[in-house]
Swiss-Prot record:
It comes from Idiomarina loihiensis (strain ATCC BAA-735 / DSM 15497 / L2-TR). GO terms for cellular component: cytosol. It comes from the Bacteria. This is UPF0301 protein IL2218. Belongs to the UPF0301 (AlgH) family.
Amino acid sequence: MNSLQNHLLIATPMLNDPMFKRTVTYICEHNEEGAMGLVINQPADLSVTSLLDKLEIVYPENNQHLQGSVYQGGPVGRERGFVIHPPQDNWRASQKMSDDIMVTTSRDILEALGSSAAPPQFLLTLGYAGWEAGQLEEELGENSWLAIPADPELLFNTPPSERWQKATEQLGFDVWQLGPDVGHA
């Protein structure tokens, strides 16, 4: 099995599940036990500053770095936060995914947001998407998802409303030309 860790899953037009329709999901873990990822293009109705307020974390006023939205990372564990950011060694609970991407789950990164210790770019998600053993592979076989290597430019510098389209452009073909039977000989 080839791991899709540090890849982006792109929902194909055939995927009509309202939770995942037109989503781009960053895969944090993929092995024989299953997969776990974070949806990166569904802003929640919650700003970063509102979340910090709810957690009683003090932050500098009028900081542009904190004006963005929190993202709906997926339907599982919606009270759990994940921060995707460029690698830094400052945090208690981090996993380096590549030379360009790290995922942190500890509160200390939230406490640093808006300060000079904060990562220069970040996506903050609540919840995650999870797949049981073999489930993601089955969905890939059904043409529900396509995968590309993770792209920091797409993660950190592309507006969320454009991430699905930009990701599909990296596939090298028109995703709208896919049929439900592609790959099934």
